[in-house]
Amino acid sequence: MLEKFARYPLTFGPTPIEKLERLSKHLGGNVEIYAKREDCNSGLAYGGNKLRKLEYIIPDAIASNADTLVSIGGVQSNHTRMIAAVAAKIGMKCRLVQEAWVPHEDAVYDRVGNIMLSRIMGADVRLVDDGFDIGIRKSWEQAIEEVKAAGGKPYAIPAGASVHKYGGLGYVGFAEEVRKQEAELGFKFDYIVVCTVTGSTHAGMLVGFAADGRARKVIGIDGSFTPAQTKAQVLSIAQNTAKLVELGKDIVADDVVLIEDYAYPAYGVPSEETKEAIRLTARLEAMITDPVYEGKSMQGLIDLTQKGYFEKGAKVLYAHLGGAPALNGYGYAFRNG
């Protein structure tokens, strides 16, 4: 479905799928849990899911003759780290807006982890006190205008690379990649579990798996704590992406499966249950998840498995999207492990 779109390679290639034997057994052994390791997808500043999206956005940035990538996220945004990394790799400047999306007060929160890496890679990082919102932000639009006023040529990439005309394409490719891996494995996954916030990862998967009738087998775990806005954004991105790739099927609201039970108490703030999920996965599989995204989707996967959401014998693919550098901003929460 993606043959007609330009792609700038930023990743190693297909990401590995591994069976989480010990976690599956710990949760009763009735469900086979696998992980697709998007967190291991590149040598660019620890990688992660945003690179798969950016592979289809960067050709447009280069064609526009831009000299500066301009993007936005929270203080510990994985996305802005990846924008800084890609800018360094392709020889562009980088302007980042880091908003106060998370009510978290670790003493070094704005000096370690993702934001530190962005600074090391040369990005112009600006902290802004505005709160969480997955939509288009005034501070980002202002940054774009400031780059222009200084004589630069900005290329605007929204939060999560999501509300961008090509934002959903990368995860259509994820679905196509999984189908090829399923052919090698000799079975198909019954469910795909993914964390959902700005929406284009989920939306791209939804479109990609709609091609073989599995759109509603993509189970989004909300991490935004604003689920109505998130669900609407997933639907909008999916519908736009379906048109772009000429899916030939309509995407409707019921195709967006979003479970809202695990985002509490706020975006970016881990509950005790999220922290326990992070510890459990680390101690059983040495697979590191973060407090903002993957810890919450892992909490959801664990709880849904224990509740019997997945039928006995189901094969569940957990999409590990990355994000471990953010753990550095939560050192006090994990000071005892």
From Swiss-Prot:
Molecular function GO terms recorded: 1-aminocyclopropane-1-carboxylate deaminase activity; D-cysteine desulfhydrase activity; pyridoxal phosphate binding
Cofactor field: pyridoxal 5'-phosphate
N6-(pyridoxal phosphate)lysine found at: K50
Tagged with keyword Hydrolase: yes
Keyword line: Hydrolase, Pyridoxal phosphate
Enzyme Commission numbers on file: 3.5.99.7
Catalysed reaction equations from the record: 1-aminocyclopropane-1-carboxylate + H2O = 2-oxobutanoate + NH4(+)
Keyword Hydrolase: yes
Enzyme class: hydrolase
Pfam families reported in the protein's UniProt record: PALP
Record: active site: S77
A single BP term in Gene Ontology: 1-aminocyclopropane-1-carboxylate metabolic process
Subunit structure: Homotrimer.
Family recorded in the similarity comment: Belongs to the ACC deaminase/D-cysteine desulfhydrase family.
Protein purpose: Catalyzes a cyclopropane ring-opening reaction, the irreversible conversion of 1-aminocyclopropane-1-carboxylate (ACC) to ammonia and alpha-ketobutyrate. Allows growth on ACC as a nitrogen source.
Protein name: 1-aminocyclopropane-1-carboxylate deaminase
Native organism: Bradyrhizobium diazoefficiens (strain JCM 10833 / BCRC 13528 / IAM 13628 / NBRC 14792 / USDA 110)
